[in-house]
Regions:
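Acidic, low-complexity central loop/insert segments
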Residues: 70-127
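Short, structured loop/turn "capping" segments at alpha-beta junctions
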Residues: 122-127, 154, 224-230
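Extended alpha-helical targeting/anchoring segments
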Residues: 131, 135-162
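Intrinsic disorder/low-complexity segments
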Residues: 163-196
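Glycine/acidic-rich beta-strand-loop module
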Residues: 44-74, 129, 142-146
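Residue-level signal for inorganic ion chemistry
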Residues: 61, 82, 137, 214, ...
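Pseudouridine synthase
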Residues: 69, 139, 144, 198-238
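Accessory RNA 3′-end/elbow-binding domains used by RNA modification enzymes
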Residues: 1-40, 44-51, 116, 166, ...
């Protein structure tokens, strides 16, 4: 029975701006703590896509019935900003690992756009050995830490876009490329050939893409080595960094006021799903798990609602709708 002294458990999404150094599971625990301190009833909390402790940015936090949709966030595309420092490769492919190789080469700034273009589309990528991928039931990072040699299986991922944000340039070198006569002309003042020590990129990627691996491969394609020194997720599925709130701000707000106005509705995680409006009788049938027939709607996934409140996700095929996932929201009950 609900505790009358506690606020009802919320249902929806919090978009957290996860700080660097905090794991996704730790972020979930922190939100649970904030809800308890805010006087809310026990609430189921989950996240919509792991963000490494060394990364920061958008982490969708699912509350209550929205946790039933958290898996959809795992399949959603993501957008990241990240910086590659050239010259060193580490075992973890980020700044926390041990340097395993060095290169004195730096890529020409002018060469970078053409190389980035080769990574757009479906590519084959080898995940980092320091990753959560399971190998024979064990996490790859646990095997790597124990000193085992690991062969990571390449996977197909999609890079929807990859663009340069800005670069950090070293002292300019001057081009010794030949003139039209195929040799340098001492009377011509040559333009400096700018070399990049680091570059910041923005990548829009499919599920399963490892930014650390992408950074490694971009550096290799530029004829050098590199590792990630900065990583921020700016979009996950429909959720953007403009909607995100820091954990510190969330804790401060919860001390003096309700946080309901920070919570996005459950359907915010389904912005690409068309709605199907139910009447009370069809809503009752859906809640009982019955099939709806003779619907004029197109095939595919639909969000069924009653009085603008989500009732279920329905899969329609040939005019027949079956329940994929039902929602037990308190406002649905008649």
């Amino acid at each position: 029975m609900p505790d009358p002294e506690k606020k009802p458990a919320p249902h929806g999404w919090l978009v957290l701006d996860k700080p660097k150094g905090l794991g996704s599971t730790q972020a979930v625990a922190a939100v649970k703590r904030v809800l308890r301190q805010g006087g809310y009833a026990k609430t189921k909390v989950g996240h919509g896509g792991t963000l490494d402790p060394l990364a920061e940015g958008v982490l969708p936090i699912a509350l209550g019935e929205a946790t039933k949709l958290a898996g959809r966030m795992l399949d959603a595309s993501k957008i990241y900003d990240f910086t590659i420092a050239f010259g060193e490769q580490t075992d973890t492919l980020d700044g926390e690992g041990e340097v395993v190789a060095r290169s004195d080469r730096r890529p020409p700034v002018a060469a970078i756009p053409a190389v980035l273009a080769h990574f757009v589309g479906e590519i084959e990528q080898v995940p980092p050995v320091y990753s959560a991928i399971r190998i024979d039931g064990k996490r790859a990072y646990d095997l790597a830490r124990s000193g085992e040699e690991i062969d990571m299986t390449p996977r197909r991922v999609t890079i929807h876009s990859l663009t340069s944000r800005h670069g950090e340039r070293s002292e300019p070198l001057y081009s010794t490329f030949a003139t039209s006569a195929s040799r340098p002309d001492p009377e011509i003042a040559y333009e400096p050939l700018e070399m990049a020590d680091a570059i910041t990129l923005r990548a829009h990627v499919s599920k399963g893409t490892y930014i650390r691996s992408l950074a490694r491969d971009v550096a290799h394609a530029l004829g050098t080595l590199g590792h990630v020194t900065y990583l921020r997720r700016i979009k996950a599925g429909p959720f953007r960094e403009e909607q995100a709130i820091s954990l510190d701000s969330l804790e401060e707000i919860a001390k003096g006021a309700a946080i309901e106005n920070l919570i996005l509705p459950l359907e915010a995680g389904l912005d690409d799903i068309p709605a199907l409006i139910l009447d009370p009788d069809s809503a009752q049938a859906v809640r009982q798990g019955r099939v709806l027939s003779d619907l004029p709607h197109p095939d595919g996934l639909h969000l069924a609602t009653l009085h603008a409140v989500p009732v279920a996700l329905l899969e329609i095929a040939g005019g027949t709708a079956k329940v994929v996932r039902g929602f037990n929201l308190p406002d649905v009950a008649e």
